């Protein structure tokens, strides 16, 4: 290869005319370099194939097998890092699903025993003779009503006990349950709630208890409306009490018996009512205000007057003690008088000739009139 002439400063001469006698070997140099390039390219392709083959084998190898590089015969590999691949731990087997707990088996309730049919009992017989009542029971009208209700309640509870109902249940149920009964021959009966018009024959003054009478002013017919059972002119006898409470405006009267013009009598035991059916008889009430408070007021006024007079009559030194003593004495007398008169009961006056009423409280049986012309 020929060297080009250089310039005096050491560089390559810019003007170098080629010598036609000297051959140019530039193309020959390029021709020698081409085989080297192909050789390097083949070596690179071979290395790439080897590298790709090694990577594919390493990935294709099982995960639990450790990779080990074996040197070819007669050659020793340079020392390098050795990686130990531990085998993968097997995943735990899933636990089997526990079966759901079965529903508890409850015992079946036993069927209730059949209830025996209630025994056939005779209905309440109103034909039985009425019990005798003393005068003390007639003095208390509310007590008479309570006794009648208690008797009927005992009858109902006894019937329920016969039907197999407990005593406590019969007591509670008996208040709301009634049994149907037959009233017998309605031509000779007066049912509860019948109104009897009556004219008072005696004056009533409630300072003391006493008797009173009235005369039936209108015929009273039977429950069927066919027969007159209580004719007008029948005398009715009753009793009233004297314990009129403060603020009361009515007196309670209990009528005990009927006396008919034919001579027939029957126990009535029914309360007196006014013309509208309200219980009790109204009248003129004297509340005894003067008797209850007059004495106390008089003593109080006298005490004040005495204190005033003594205050003016005595001197300043001894008047205080005298005034206090007199005032205390009069106040004690007024309090004592008030305690004795404050509980005086009022008095009710009911004049004779007033129109009143009687409300029948129990069934009345007039079967004794059957077969007669009355």
Curated annotation (Swiss-Prot):
Q: Bias regions of kind Pro residues — which residues?
A: 92-117
Q: Where mainly located?
A: membrane
Q: Name one Pfam family in it.
A: TrbI
The listed locations are: Cell membrane
Which InterPro entries does the record associate with it?
Answer: T4SS_VirB10/PtlG, T4SS_VirB10/TraB/TrbI, T4SS_VirB10/TrbI
Supply the alphabetized keyword list.
Cell membrane, Membrane, Transmembrane, Transmembrane helix
Q: Which NCBIfam families match?
A: T4SS_VirB10
| Protein family per UniProt | Belongs to the TrbI/VirB10 family.
Recorded protein name is Type IV secretion system protein PtlG homolog
Q: Which organism is it from?
A: Bordetella bronchiseptica (strain ATCC BAA-588 / NCTC 13252 / RB50) (Alcaligenes bronchisepticus)
């Amino acid at each position: 290869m020929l060297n080009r002439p250089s310039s005096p400063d050491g560089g390559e001469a810019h003007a170098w005319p080629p010598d036609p006698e000297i051959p140019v070997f530039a193309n020959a140099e390029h021709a020698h370099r081409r085989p080297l390039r192909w050789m390097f390219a083949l070596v690179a392709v071979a290395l790439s194939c080897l590298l790709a083959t090694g990577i594919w084998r390493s990935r294709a190898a099982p995960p639990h097998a450790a990779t080990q590089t074996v040197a070819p015969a007669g050659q020793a590999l340079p020392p390098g890092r050795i990686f130990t691949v531990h085998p993968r731990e097997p995943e735990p087997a899933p636990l089997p699903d526990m079966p759901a707990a079965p529903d508890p088996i409850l015992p079946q309730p036993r069927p209730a025993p059949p209830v025996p049919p209630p025994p056939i009992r005779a209905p309440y017989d109103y034909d039985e003779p009425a019990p005798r009542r003393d005068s003390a029971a007639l003095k208390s009208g509310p007590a008479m009503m309570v006794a009648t209700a208690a008797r009927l309640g005992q009858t109902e509870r006894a019937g329920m006990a016969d039907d197999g109902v407990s005593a406590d249940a019969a007591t509670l149920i008996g208040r709301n349950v009634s049994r149907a009964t037959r009233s017998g021959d309605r031509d000779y009966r007066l049912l509860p709630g019948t109104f009897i018009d009556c004219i008072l024959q005696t004056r009533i003054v409630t300072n003391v208890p006493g008797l009173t009478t009235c005369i039936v002013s209108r015929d009273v017919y039977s429950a069927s409306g066919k027969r007159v059972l209580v004719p007008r002119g029948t005398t009715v006898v009753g009793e009233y009490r004297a314990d009129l409470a403060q603020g009361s405006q009515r007196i309670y009267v209990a009528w005990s018996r009927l006396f008919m013009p034919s001579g027939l009598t029957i126990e009535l035991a029914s309360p007196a009512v006014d013309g509208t059916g309200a219980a009790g008889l109204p009248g003129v009430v004297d509340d005894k205000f003067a008797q209850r408070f007059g004495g106390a007021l008089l003593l109080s006024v006298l005490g004040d007057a005495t204190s005033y007079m003594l205050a003016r009559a005595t001197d300043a030194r001894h008047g205080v003690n005298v005034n206090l003593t007199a005032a205390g004495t009069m106040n004690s007398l007024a309090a004592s008088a008030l305690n004795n008169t404050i509980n005086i009961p009022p008095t009710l006056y009911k004049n004779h000739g007033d129109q009143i009423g009687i409300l029948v409280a129990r069934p009345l049986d007039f079967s004794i009139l059957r077969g007669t012309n009355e």
